[in-house]
């Protein structure tokens, strides 16, 4: 730990005695670093040690004298005068010499001396920083208000009244501010400061930003410090770059940042972009990250992404050698076969270092279980593909391995890869067809595989089945509807929504193509299945009915009374509850999801960004849930007392059933939002409720194979005594 770090720790902890002791030691340094001394003094100034240090601040003067001329030397002197409390002749002489040398002959020079206390020398603490501030107070210069008014432009100054007139970006009218208040709340900004350019010349800065994206980000980081991608967007979007152009502009900027060396990119969206003062080579940045990494798996990931994103760097022989050495020097446990394999794959497949450890003999020595375990512990998809290519080339059981991945992987990229490999092997085609047809007969066995292949088949991208074979298409379509019905209330319900989105997309194009020339029995079954799928709205069902009628006009005679079923009955309590749920989805969850997407997008490389993909999938789910719920609310009708009739069984009725042995069962029939089977409240759409609808007193109802007579029909309002 160097002096700066040690002193900062002591300042933060308020250890005055230890600080003064270490400071005394620091003062004996032969070499003084101006930037380091500035940081120490600024830390002291903002701490509880400021008044104590002010009594010995004269010890800084010899250090100040050793600093070369420049900004750091001027800043150290300002801080000395800010901290001093003695107002001694030595400090007075140093201060007056400084202002005479820097500002003599400037307008209002003598008035400024009087304002800061350098005319009479009685109290001139803060004199230099305040004098610099007053010399900055010229019309057209810029300041920043620390109290929330933002950037301001100086419109006028009066030394007689000791006031300055400033127009702020966040205030409607210009403000008169006294010098005393200005000293405490305003910070001067140079003309080339990011905030000055953004406020003073927005059109010119926008044009500059569009032509020079990386330079603008550098200016922002230089003047405002390290920023995350989200914070960079907050500073630029609409204020510099129009929101409509933001995504394209930011993607371009990130690409250039990645190729450049002045800005160090973060490893995840929550970390900031940092401007490197001296610039750091790509290899230097990688070496820094490798030095901070705590485990070999993370180091392998860093090296892989370096090779992938900056492949042109490999033309440099020294860089290639450094990467090889970094991989060979990795501390990998002998038993960690997966990490060893990943390292060897990077060396052989990406860096051209052929190693005998992953030759034909090694691949053939692996069992099927060994191969699966190695893949499970290999997070980088590209390395998985490289390994599988070797398995395909040398292993006798490659088909089994590839088929298992096809069935169980959650990565669409990997599923596409193994599917194409199997499909391109003539001896495996029939096995592949059989497996996919099995998935159509039992889609719940491998739900993700079924949905993935159904979409591929519907788009004629499978390259396996004859696109003219409508029977295969219809088999999968029928299975898709069964699947949608089965998954509606399971953890796989999002897959059902995905199928629904596909089937109704492009004006039901997939459905129209699949049912072309279909038989009447098939279409009847299709329409029946569609009514069981909760994902389909009433308008969807109407469209499906119309599409089927185009293929088989006789279906018009069998047209179900969809219009009568269109109403969704609800109690007023459930209606209010569902409206509140919709408002929560639209007002909170969608906003939170938008933030998740932006945070995940911010790194720019979306190819293997799982967080970004998950956030997009969540957005699609939320949008679909909002669409379905909005449609249901539009169809909803609140059940009232005058709408319930007890001459026959209908919605809003409580039905008493009596068996042959005298046993009594009671059911209440309400809409789907109010259904509660545990309390014997049936949904109007349930099979049992449908069997009872329209029946009258003494009519027979079959329940679990037994006959029951309807002994009583009453309104739910009679039950409540209303």
From Swiss-Prot:
GO terms for biological process: DNA-templated transcription elongation; regulation of DNA-templated transcription elongation. Residues 565-722 are annotated as: GREA. The gene is greA. This is Transcription elongation factor GreA. Belongs to the GreA/GreB family. Necessary for efficient RNA polymerase transcription elongation past template-encoded arresting sites. The arresting sites in DNA have the property of trapping a certain fraction of elongating RNA polymerases that pass through, resulting in locked ternary complexes. Cleavage of the nascent transcript by cleavage factors such as GreA or GreB allows the resumption of elongation from the new 3'terminus. GreA releases sequences of 2 to 3 nucleotides. Residues 606-643 form a coiled coil. The lineage of its organism: Bacteria, Pseudomonadati, Chlamydiota, Chlamydiia, Chlamydiales. It comes from the Bacteria. NCBIfam families: greA, PRK06330.1. The keyword Transcription applies. Signal peptide: none annotated. Residues 1-504 form the GRAD1 domain. Keywords: Coiled coil, DNA-binding, Transcription, Transcription regulation. GO terms for molecular function: DNA binding; RNA polymerase binding.
């Amino acid at each position: 730990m160097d002096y700066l770090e040690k002193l900062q720790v002591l300042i933060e902890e308020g250890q005055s005695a230890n600080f003064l002791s270490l400071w005394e030691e620091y003062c004996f340094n032969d070499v003084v670093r101006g930037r380091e001394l500035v940081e120490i003094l600024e830390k002291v100034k903002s701490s509880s040690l400021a008044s104590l240090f002010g009594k010995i601040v004269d010890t800084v003067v010899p250090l100040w004298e050793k600093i070369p001329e420049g900004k750091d030397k001027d800043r150290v002197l300002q801080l000395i005068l800010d901290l001093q409390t003695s107002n001694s002749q030595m400090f007075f002489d140093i201060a007056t010499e400084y202002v005479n040398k820097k500002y003599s002959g400037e307008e209002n020079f003598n008035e400024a001396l009087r304002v800061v206390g350098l005319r009479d020398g009685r109290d001139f603490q803060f004199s230099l920083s305040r004098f610099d501030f007053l010399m900055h107070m010229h019309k057209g210069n810029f300041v920043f208000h620390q109290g929330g008014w933002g950037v301001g432009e100086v419109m006028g100054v009066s030394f007689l009244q000791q006031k300055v007139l400033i127009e702020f970006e966040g205030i409607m009218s210009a403000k008169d501010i006294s010098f005393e208040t200005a000293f405490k709340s305003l910070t001067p900004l140079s003309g080339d400061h990011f905030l000055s350019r953004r406020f003073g010349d927005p059109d010119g800065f926008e044009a500059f930003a569009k032509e020079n994206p990386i330079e603008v980000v550098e200016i922002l980081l230089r003047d405002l410090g390290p920023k995350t991608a989200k914070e960079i967007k907050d500073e630029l979007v609409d204020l510099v770059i129009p929101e409509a152009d933001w995504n394209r502009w930011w993607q371009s900027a990130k690409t250039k940042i990645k190729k450049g060396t002045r800005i160090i990119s973060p490893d995840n969206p929550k970390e900031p972009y940092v401007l490197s003062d001296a610039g750091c080579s790509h290899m230097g940045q990688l070496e820094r990250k490798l030095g901070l990494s705590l485990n070999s798996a993370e180091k392998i990931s860093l090296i892989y992404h370096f090779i992938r994103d900056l492949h042109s760097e490999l033309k440099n022989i020294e860089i290639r050698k450094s990467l090889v050495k970094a991989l060979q020097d990795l501390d990998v446990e002998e038993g960690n076969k997966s990490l060893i394999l990943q390292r060897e794959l990077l060396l052989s497949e990406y860096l051209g270092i052929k190693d005998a450890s992953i030759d034909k003999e090694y691949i053939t020595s692996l069992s099927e279980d060994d191969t699966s375990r190695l893949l499970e512990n290999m997070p980088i998809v590209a390395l998985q593909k490289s390994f599988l290519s070797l398995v395909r080339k040398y292993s006798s059981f490659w088909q089994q391995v590839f088929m298992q991945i096809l069935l169980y992987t959650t990565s669409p990229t990997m599923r596409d890869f193994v599917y194409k490999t199997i499909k391109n092997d003539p001896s495996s085609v029939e096995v592949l067809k059989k497996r996919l047809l099995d998935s159509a007969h039992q889609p719940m066995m491998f739900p993700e595989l079924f949905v993935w292949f159904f979409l591929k088949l519907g788009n004629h991208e499978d390259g396996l089945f004859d696109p003219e074979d409508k029977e295969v298409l219809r088999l999968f379509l029928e299975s898709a509807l069964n699947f949608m019905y089965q998954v509606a209330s399971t953890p796989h319900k999002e897959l059902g929504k995905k199928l629904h989105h596909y089937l109704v997309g492009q004006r039901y194009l997939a459905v129209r193509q699949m049912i072309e020339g279909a038989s009447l029995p098939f279409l009847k079954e299709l329409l029946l299945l569609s009514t069981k799928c909760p994902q389909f709205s009433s308008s969807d069902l109407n469209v499906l009915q119309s599409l089927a009628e185009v293929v088989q006009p006789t279906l018009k005679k069998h047209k179900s009374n969809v219009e009568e079923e269109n109403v969704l009955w609800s109690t007023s309590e459930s209606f209010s509850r569902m409206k509140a749920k919709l408002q929560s989805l639209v007002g909170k969850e969608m906003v939170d999801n938008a933030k998740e997407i932006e945070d995940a997008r911010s790194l720019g490389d979306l190819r293997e960004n799982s967080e970004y993909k998950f956030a997009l999938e969540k957005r699609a789910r939320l949008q679909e849930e909002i669409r379905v719920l909005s449609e249901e609310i539009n169809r909803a009708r609140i059940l009232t007392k005058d709408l319930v009739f007890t001459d026959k069984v209908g919605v809003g009725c409580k039905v008493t059933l009596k068996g042959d042995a005298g046993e009594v069962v009671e059911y209440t029939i309400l809409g789907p939002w109010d259904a509660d089977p545990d309390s014997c409240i049936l949904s109007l759409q349930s099979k049992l409720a449908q069997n009872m609808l329209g029946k009258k007193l003494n009519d027979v109802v079959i329940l679990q194979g037994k006959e029951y007579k309807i002994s009583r029909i009453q309104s739910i309002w009679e039950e409540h005594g209303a």
